[in-house]
Amino acid sequence: IGANDGQFGKNLRKIGYKGQIISFEPIVSAYIDLEDTSKKDKKWKVFNFALGKNIEETEINISQNSLSSSILDMKKEHLNSAPTSRYVKREKISVKTLDSFKEEICKNFKNIYIKIDTQGYEEKVLIGAKDLVRQAIGLQLEMSIYPMYESQLLFNEFFKKIEKLNFELWDIERTFSNPKSGKILQIDAIFFKKN
């Protein structure tokens, strides 16, 4: 969720994963690349919309580097740490909830692993995916240690919410740091369902 041009899906195939992949990317230019990447793979479906807690139309801020694009406004700490993350334009997008069409896309799936990288919007995605999260065995979420986007949930609060959903932390990967100070700003956290 927040697939960009399909980097994560490509990596899954490189390490030997042969199962279904379902990717969501709302930005048209990134979606075109994602669609091109996935079209030779019969087990990889792609959708051109965002996921959130409500079904709605909104605008997304497009960043110069594409990877930092977000529905939310960016904080100065982020921009100062990565000047190419600055917003250069806005694009109208559709937002749906994952639960609103989960039957359509993953009706008979087992061992569901959900990866969410939506630049501060991860909590909203989870709210709209409550039913599917209950079925999932794993979650991978980008989380900010310090505020990178307006009104986003930070790691310490997010961690508690994920634990209440019966998941436990398995791994953390540093994904974004201030290049001058080395201060860690964002991580990818991997959680698996408790037995």
Regions found by a protein language model. Give the residues of each.
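Phosphate/nucleotide-binding beta-alpha loop and adjacent structural elements of enzyme active sites
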Residues: 1-195
